[in-house]
Swiss-Prot record:
Tissue: Chorionic epithelium (trophectoderm) and placental cotyledons.
Lineage: superkingdom: Eukaryota
Modifications after synthesis and translation: Glycosylated.
Protein name, UniProt field: Unknown placental glycoprotein 45J2
Amino acid sequence: SKDNQKNYIPLIVPFAT
């Protein structure tokens, strides 16, 4: 559960910028 939230954060960070 906690790993899933941290896994999706780095994925949306590079593309969101």
